[in-house]
Regions:
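Conserved active-site segment immediately N-terminal to the catalytic lysine
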Residues: 248-260
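Active-site and channel-lining beta-strand-loop segments
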Residues: 28-51
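Catalytic PLP-binding core of fold-type I/II PLP enzymes
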Residues: 210-244
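Short acidic, glycine-rich surface-loop motifs adjacent to enzyme active sites
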Residues: 193-209
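PLP-dependent aspartate aminotransferase-fold enzymes
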Residues: 95-197
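Glycine-rich loop-to-alpha-helix module at the N-terminal edge of alpha/beta enzyme cores
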Residues: 4-6, 18-20, 46-133
Length: 260
């Protein structure tokens, strides 16, 4: 029987907690090396990493093709002028933006950002610019991030929201079956309130891997058009090919106005 964490990891985690704010760490794993889907901690214990929910996680560790590209880029003068993508133009950003557009909805533009929560924050700001400072709509059990604005529309764990003020939000049920009696709840909200946007995941990640019913998402798109409200799909955890298509909305026969 292997004791996890081992002695080195236990010691480091204890020392770590003395000097850092323990906010998102949930498991006492101290990674030393990794290759493909295997990682090894500082005690020499090997783990299989099944995480694939965000960012580049599905690519695993130390993918040889990626390492070669990074090595080539960092060892040449190509990387010398890339201070920050938001300050200067560069070919690499143009190329990746073009590739993203080739697999996304038509007539849209790309805005690069640092994290999922920051993407949601800016999606909200874009909607506010169009509609004004009105309430937004999000679904119960959705997760959109822990920054203050995104947190207002994160409804997966109440503990995350304790002691923080909220932006105005209207909550609706996330329906997973077409026969749900509350599948038209959004229509009642839009009849009563003028809103700035509708924000939802299609497959809820942190909320429990709940898959939205096809009718639910199609109704949201229909009502967003009918009431002229921007529809934001949060694809941070479901996008980039994780469902067999580039974006999960493709399975539903609809497109968002804004996507993160």
């Amino acid at each position: 029987m292997v004791n996890i964490p081992g002695p080195k990891a236990t010691k480091l985690v204890d020392e770590f907690k003395k000097i850092t704010y323990d906010s998102t760490f949930t498991y006492p794993l101290v990674i030393k090396t990794g290759r493909r889907c295997k990682i090894e901690d500082i005690d020499g214990i090997e783990f299989l990493d099944f995480t694939s929910n965000i960012g580049s996680c599905p690519l695993g560790y130390s993918h040889p093709d990626i390492l070669e590209i990074i090595k080539e880029y960092c060892s040449s003068e190509r990387g010398a002028h890339k201070i920050a993508g938001q300050d200067f133009y560069c070919e690499e950003h143009f190329n990746i933006a073009s590739k993203l557009l080739s697999v996304s909805k038509k007539n849209c533009k790309v805005f690069f950002i640092n994290s999922g929560a920051e993407a949601v924050e800016n999606a909200i700001k874009i909607a506010y610019k169009k509609m004004g400072p009105l309430p937004g709509v999000s679904c119960i059990s959705d997760f959109h991030g822990r920054t203050l604005g995104a947190l207002s529309f994160t409804l997966s764990k109440e503990v995350q929201k304790t002691n923080f003020p909220e932006l105005p939000v209207k909550r609706i049920k996330f329906c997973t079956v077409d026969s749900d009696p509350q599948i038209n709840q959004l229509e009642s909200v839009l009849k009563e309130y003028k809103v700035a946007f509708i924000l939802t995941e299609i497959i809820q990640g942190e909320g429990g891997l709940n898959v939205a019913s096809k009718l639910f998402i199609q109704n949201i798109r229909k009502l967003a058009d009918e009431y002229n409200v921007p529809l934001i799909f949060d694809e941070v955890q479901s996008g980039m090919g994780r469902t067999g298509k580039w974006w999960v909305y493709e399975h539903y026969g609809v497109e968002p106005d804004i996507m993160t």
